[in-house]
Amino acid sequence: MYKKKKSYQSLKNLNTFSINVTAKKIIFVKTIQSLMKIWKTCNLSNIPYIILGEGSNVLFLENYAGVVIINRIKGIRIEEKKKNWLLHVFSGEKWHDLVKYTLRMGFFGLENLALIPGSVGSAAIQNIGAYGLELKNICQYVDVISLENGKTIRLKKKTCNFSYRSSIFKYKYNNGYAVIAVGIKIKKNWKPVIFSSLLKSKKILEINAYKIFNIVCQIRKKKLPNLKKLGNAGSFFKNPIITSKKTKKILSSYMKMPYYIQKNGFIKIPAAWLIEKYNFKNIQIGDAAIYKKQKLILINLKKANSKDILKLAQIIQKCILKKFGIYLEPEVDFINSLGKVKLL
């Protein structure tokens, strides 16, 4: 039925923020059948439940009153087409492990997304992205299962409503559904996705997928905190997307502000730049702080609780709103005793 079942166990090692909260039960599942059986038990008994992968994009606000289901449904199926490789990847696979696997197999195209924490399922839900590439660029379909009747629904890329760090799986296919697999299309005719840090590399003229993978890993290791030492959920805030009018207003005071024009005409501003320009110095709430090497990341120095992190996040939001007129939207999901909630 499931690999492990724990009662009133700490979730500290199951969320990358390392928040020391508990759940009524923690259950690791390895099959779809196990997942459905547990869901039915929770549903019949009116017990709250939540499905997690690697716990890399969540902040637990308090002890969870229900069952935390840890998705360990794994497996990769490969289908060869004339021009592409099609990978059917189950949602419990670790994303970075998938990237390494494709490189070993000689399938190139995922290397820009190396070292992103989390599972394949959460990659689709979140539409992960980095260094010029997003999940939506390589996704063929996403399979979700109705936990009520066991029917699998395949959503092709166009119907997934992928957008900046979001998808249809964050709202419509949320309660009563679970992402079980992601279809990924990798072109045989590989072309590198070039990004600014890559252009600065001396090896740009002899670039290949393996070198891009190594460069991305080096960059991320250099600027991102070690999860084993400093709890965090990666980028705490989304990069704000604002109007050209507001962008021009800010540029009149900050001529060197970086910005990126979107296809719809709106402008994306790096949230890390906004936070850095405010100059919060060494602000710290309890054991919650801003990571010095990447201002977009809030860290748990040792024993921070959710209140510390939330208070720090609120201070940042208020200050950035006052100085730039920009609201920083959280990227992490907040979970209270009954499930996901909207905060900040």
UniProtKB/Swiss-Prot annotation:
Signal sequence segment: none
Pathway: Cell wall biogenesis; peptidoglycan biosynthesis
Subcellular location per the Swiss-Prot or TrEMBL entry: Cytoplasm
Cofactor(s) in the UniProt record: FAD
Catalytic machinery residues: R165, S235 (proton donor), E331
GO cellular component, one term: cytosol
Enzyme class (EC, first level): oxidoreductase
UniProt-listed Pfam families: FAD_binding_4, MurB_C
Protein name: UDP-N-acetylenolpyruvoylglucosamine reductase
Protein role: Cell wall formation.
Residues covered by the FAD-binding PCMH-type domain: 19-189
Family that this chain belongs to: Belongs to the MurB family.
Keywords (A to Z) from UniProt: Cell cycle, Cell division, Cell shape, Cell wall biogenesis/degradation, Cytoplasm, FAD, Flavoprotein, NADP, Oxidoreductase, Peptidoglycan synthesis
PROSITE patterns xrefs: FAD_PCMH
Keyword Flavoprotein (UniProt): yes
GO BP: any one term: cell wall organization
NCBIfam families, A to Z: murB, PRK00046.1
Source superkingdom: Bacteria
EC number: 1.3.1.98
